[in-house]
């Protein structure tokens, strides 16, 4: 096709489109793909297509500058698109991703996107851009069923040409496969094959919207692992912690296992179940702690955790290997310090976290639901996302000490890949006074509890009063006090016995005198208290008064014996009494004292 004819054809074609945003004229500027180098990566279960496009402004009498250009996707692949990104070649990827917006072209099928250029393109000027697309579920297993010992083969169908609304002068295509074992592939333009690479082209003067089926059938044993459903829950606490939990449903979407599964062959033969999945690695944030991994049965102990400088690597090994068509479900959770992800200025808060995190290499997520539980009282909630997400109505979540519920943001998205591992920012306002709500609730709850107990024990809930029962309760209370005082008085005697023994060893008369004085003082006080309690028993008309009186008399005799024992010890130390005589006298005193104490014990038991 000659150049003037090509330009005329292009102008007629572009005349049916709406003008590009920012165009100076009512007609779209005439553009052409001067050179296209496509790379189709089929080495995993994803189809990654990267195109380096040299876009040229033809001019052709038009003085309008091009501020944007159009991208098109084949109707056969448009439904499988997971990611589309465009950037200027040679510039930093993160800072120079171009703005892409979906649009429609009247009379044309497929999906179209408008890409805004960083700088308007003058007539005759050129710009090199890189277009990256990722497709999911486009590699179809063929055969669809295999045995445990067979290898997996897949079929991919695409386009030999770069599908574009603009004509293309020259283009090439390189296909990277998962292995060198290729059953068949299309032969358009006599492609060259080297190991696991197929090279097509160059194709010259390709008209716009050109399509020619490209098909390849080859061996691909990479893990066809797909997350069919995933729920990611992020619970934010202003007390320093962010809890993350992920509920994951996994499925092997490769060729379905045909026939029985042999664990013996699987362990013995290295190539048995070569396309199955034994384990995979999940990358958690570097600050992750308290990590757990469980399924429906419980904790799975076959997992391993490796803490690195910039991440935490978790090897997840399901309870059984995954073959084609097999499914499993598991839960992973961990805690994060909030100071790394939560920022605030006054009452303004911003939570910056990933919408989806790394689950495994070359991940595919069919359906993702993200729930972000904010603190109770959060208001004016807004979300900034690097890509389009859908929002469901906000929910309320109730947990300990909540009164009106915590707001829950519910967002979801379908067909996600690794390129979607990006941060979202949740903005909200929160009155810091509300942080005192839960501590005050705890204090109030304990106050009410103690106050209720106090009131309860002081109230009389009996229907009729029983004077006899009240009298018995009073007598029992007085008796309990008498028992306590008697035990203390017996303890005084034992303490004085120890003082006498120390005196016999040290011969220090001051020690003995001090012990006597202490015994007299404390014994007098205890005896007086018991006498008062005895009078109260008499007032209540209890017959226990006589028993207490008898016990007092017996105690007086015990005291005399205790003091007599001290006198004997003084005579022994002074040399006025022989040791043999002292031992005989001490035996007599101890025997009488034991008889008296036994009688007192009987009286106490009767009380």
Swiss-Prot record:
Q: Topological domains (Lumenal): residue ranges?
A: 24-434
Disulfide bridge positions per record = none
The membrane topology noted for this protein in its Swiss-Prot or TrEMBL record is: Single-pass type I membrane protein
Which residues carry attached sugars according to the database record?
A: 299
Post-translational modification summary for this protein? Ubiquitinated by the ECS(ASB11) complex.
**Where located?**
Endoplasmic reticulum membrane
Q: Where on the tree of life does the source sit, at the highest rank?
A: Eukaryota
Residue numbers of N6-acetyllysine PTMs: 187, 538
Signal peptide span: 1-23
Instruction: Name its GO BP terms in alphabetical order.
Output: protein N-linked glycosylation via asparagine
Membrane-spanning residues: 435-455
Q: What are its GO cellular component terms?
A: oligosaccharyltransferase complex
Membrane-side (Cytoplasmic) residue stretches: 456-607
Q: What does this protein do?
A: Subunit of the oligosaccharyl transferase (OST) complex that catalyzes the initial transfer of a defined glycan (Glc(3)Man(9)GlcNAc(2) in eukaryotes) from the lipid carrier dolichol-pyrophosphate to an asparagine residue within an Asn-X-Ser/Thr consensus motif in nascent polypeptide chains, the first step in protein N-glycosylation. N-glycosylation occurs cotranslationally and the complex associates with the Sec61 complex at the channel-forming translocon complex that mediates protein translocation across the endoplasmic reticulum (ER). All subunits are required for a maximal enzyme activity.
Under PANTHER family, the record lists:
DOLICHYL-DIPHOSPHOOLIGOSACCHARIDE--PROTEIN GLYCOSYLTRANSFERASE SUBUNIT 1 (PTHR21049:SF0), RIBOPHORIN I (PTHR21049)
This one is known as: Dolichyl-diphosphooligosaccharide--protein glycosyltransferase subunit 1
Origin species = Pongo abelii
Lineage of the species this protein comes from: Eukaryota, Metazoa, Chordata, Craniata, Vertebrata
